Amino acid sequence: ERTPTDLYLWLVKYQKELSHQFGWEIKPSSAIEGLAAAYGNRLIHRWKRLKNQLFPMSSSQPPPVGDWRKTHLVPRKEGQIFSSILVGINGKDSGWRALEQALIIAQIENSAVRGLHIIKGEFDPSDDQIREIRAEFRKRSAPHKISAKLYLEQGEVLNLLNERARWNDLLVFSLEHPPKDRPAARLRSNLRGLIQTCPRPLLAVPSPSPMRHALLAYDGSPKATEALYLAAYLVEHWGIKLTVVTALEDSTSRHNPLHKAQEYLASREIEASLFSDVGLPSDVIISAMNKRGCDFIIVGGYGYQPVMEVLFGSTLNGLLRKSEKPILICH
């Protein structure tokens, strides 16, 4: 039977092998989660005692509701929840907007930014286009005086973003192609797949924002409650202003989820503006954002079972199509 010391030494070796193989700086806790994803629960059970002693709990993909919060919203040694931010770099204006947003957050949180440019086929690192992307990344990152590094990898975009997100705390990406409002389009949507399976919170960026006034879209669901917890953290640690909105089916509805949100925020002594309106949820949320001057949205991830979401759509899909401000997606 291996001792905790033996297991720890093996983990350190595995962490170094991963870092050498992929060229990424990987935290021990992220290496453990990588083992879970690769080899399943049986191997990870052997780590349980050591993990409880040394690292936050983590689990294999797909993440259960609340798993990220239990790992990141408890006090961490670094004193931050987004210590490392992954941002997809596509070499287009949309990708540079996503980088700008990641840099804004990194300055608030004192985070490191890791850009990832994914190439589907074979590539030459000395190619003119790649050199231009590297140069542009350095030019845009340098004025912020934070740790920023660009990685180049070959593979399928969705899979690589998911895998590398596990080694970071937040995934930031450009919002170029939101799911269209048709079942067949939703079924084929890579963005939908990314949001459903990503092990970390995601920030979809149509255009950058200073992120000073959040609109929390709250319906009382488990994932919306996770968004509520994150919103409370941002108020307390970033000093943002918070507005909470709920969409009701009709004006006679007896149950209003805002009561639960108000009770939680009051327990944390957090001030927020709360209101509800009747209508299609995505329309109510976008209208509230515009009227209240909010500069980003916080929302829970997909709430339906996959088949139901494909057939009937979701509030999140509507927001991804309609919002001109960043959307922070929690699960």
List each model region and its residues.
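Gly/Ser-rich helix-loop-strand patches that form or flank binding pockets
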Residues: 57-72, 101, 160-208, 289-331
